[in-house]
Amino acid sequence: MQEFSLWCDFIERDFLENDFLKLINKGAICGATSNPSLFCEAITKSAFYKDEIAKLKGKKAKEIYETLALKDILQASSALMPLYEKDPNNGYISLEIDPFLEDDAAKSIDEAKRLFKTLNRPNVMIKVPASESGIEVVSALTQASIPVNVTLVFSPKIAGEIAQILAKEAQKRAVISVFVSRFDKEIDPLVPKNLQAQSGIINATECYYQINQHANKLTSTLFASTGVKSNSLAKDYYIKALCFKNSINTAPLEALNAYLLDPNTECQTPLKTTEIEAFKKELKVHNIDLENTAQKLLKEGLIAFKQSFEKLLSSF
């Protein structure tokens, strides 16, 4: 399916040197993403960083982090570069800016430009959260011809606004990362069984429509947070349900491996807007508004990434 791409939402030194290469070589994935939580998990729990951390002792915590993270990003970039050279729409790895700069547009822009210049790779995307100041950062980076991954997108309204900016200004590849499963984790305990495990897909589909309404050929919807939060769902539930044209799904390894055992042979047809509106009306019967939920989840996501980054820095 040329219209649909699968990326890997995982980064860790041993993985990059082994299974990551296997996934690329067999055509299973054509890109990857990272975030502060993934780096925290990898660096604090994997033995493959210990020697390098020991050699960096005495340096500032953020300097240690950047030394380790940028090495991983460069390694992923090199592995993906043949895909990028074949098709500049594929072969990207994403690196997120310091979560603690989230509410300071000027400092975020400076850091993003510094990181992109340091890495000096055309297939690196800078990840920017979809906060109020983050949208300003996205505009500045796209004008500077830096590929961007706009992350923590929960609201269709915000997705549309970002797509409009990218449609006017994007000169390089861009993706809008729509988070999915966190909606179901939030809403499912509040609704009857017949409405469960649907809110994330419904909301993501509405975001997809908003993005496609405005986006240019350089911009795609990237479905993120596609690992299941419930044991009752198939591990690849969100990949299969959101296998749409001109979209990407970045998935954790468990979901990715499950999907590869029985992949879709063709793209899914998204729900109609009338079906989306009907579902939202049903949610309102239970006093649930998806836009309000989106705002809550964005705030929680920003806090979670800060907490992960702080935990990682304090580990040094």
From Swiss-Prot:
UniProt enzyme class: transferase
GO BP term, pick one: carbohydrate metabolic process
Name by which UniProt lists this protein: Transaldolase
Keywords: Cytoplasm, Pentose shunt, Schiff base, Transferase
Localization per Swiss-Prot or TrEMBL: Cytoplasm
Catalytic activity: D-sedoheptulose 7-phosphate + D-glyceraldehyde 3-phosphate = D-erythrose 4-phosphate + beta-D-fructose 6-phosphate
Active site (catalytic residues): 127 (schiff-base intermediate with substrate)
Gene3D superfamilies: Aldolase class I
Domain of life from the UniProt record: Bacteria
Pfam family, one: TAL_FSA
GO cellular component: cytoplasm
Keyword Zinc: no
Protein's job: Transaldolase is important for the balance of metabolites in the pentose-phosphate pathway.
Record-annotated membrane-spanning stretches: none
Gene Ontology terms for molecular function: transaldolase activity
Family per similarity comment: Belongs to the transaldolase family. Type 2 subfamily.
Species this protein is from: Helicobacter pylori (strain ATCC 700392 / 26695)
